[in-house]
């Protein structure tokens, strides 16, 4: 439960065009969450995540305004994660994950507890918080990890067409404190799936971590 004060005092108590923390000047049950998780490891190669959520932050986070939605979206928005993963004995270990997983784009989380601020940035609310599809992650070295993915759409509960989208990410831990991340995304996110209308998106993040 949260309370966001807005000194513009909108009559409808809403922060327009926002997907998270959108209800202002009132107590708001923004998010409740319960989940189970099992990580992969060499001694137990299968992993999974399953969780359920509810609250006002679960209402619009998985859609773009005006887009067609998947059937049953009002129920599916309560699914936090739902995936299985496998650590394949390939080289240093290839992790394959299928289902609904955390987004490979963006920096802030849908869940306020994971962020520096209670309200998320405009960029975060216009970047997917979750993805539905399959991804494969491989640690090239102790410093460099690469990932490729195929997903159903930019927003996982939107349904502009029946074509998948594609992308990749690399993470380079340059020093113990300094990390560079880049995600590249390409996909047909309109009704017209011609390549001239594809969404091309690059997400670059430089992270500096100080002392604990």
Predicted regions and their residues:
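Outer membrane beta-barrel
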Residues: 1-16, 21-153, 162-164, 171-179
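A generic structural signal for short coil/turn motifs at secondary-structure boundaries
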Residues: 59, 156-158, 190-194
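Detector for outer-membrane/organellar transmembrane beta-barrel domains
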Residues: 142-145, 168-212
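Short, solvent-exposed loop/turn segments at conserved positions within beta-propeller repeat blades
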Residues: 160-163, 197
């Amino acid at each position: 439960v949260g309370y966001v004060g807005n000194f513009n005092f909108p009559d409808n108590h809403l922060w327009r065009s926002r997907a998270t923390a959108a209800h202002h000047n009132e107590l708001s049950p923004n998010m409740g969450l319960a989940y189970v998780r099992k990580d992969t490891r060499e001694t137990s190669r299968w992993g999974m995540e399953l969780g359920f959520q509810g609250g006002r932050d679960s209402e619009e986070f998985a859609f773009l305004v005006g887009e067609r939605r998947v059937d049953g979206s009002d129920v599916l928005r309560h699914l936090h994660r739902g995936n299985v993963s496998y650590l394949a004995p390939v080289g240093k270990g290839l992790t394959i994950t299928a289902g609904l997983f955390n987004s490979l784009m963006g920096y802030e989380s849908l869940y306020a507890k994971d962020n520096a601020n209670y309200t998320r940035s405009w960029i975060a609310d216009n970047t997917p918080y979750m993805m539905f599809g399959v991804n494969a992650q491989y640690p090239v070295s102790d410093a460099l990890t690469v990932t490729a993915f195929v997903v159903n759409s930019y927003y996982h509960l939107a349904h502009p067409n029946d074509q998948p989208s594609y992308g990749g990410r690399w993470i380079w831990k340059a020093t113990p404190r300094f990390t560079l991340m880049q995600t590249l995304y390409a996909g047909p996110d309109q009704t017209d799936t011609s390549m001239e209308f594809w969404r091309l998106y690059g997400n670059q993040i430089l992270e500096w971590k100080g002392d604990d």
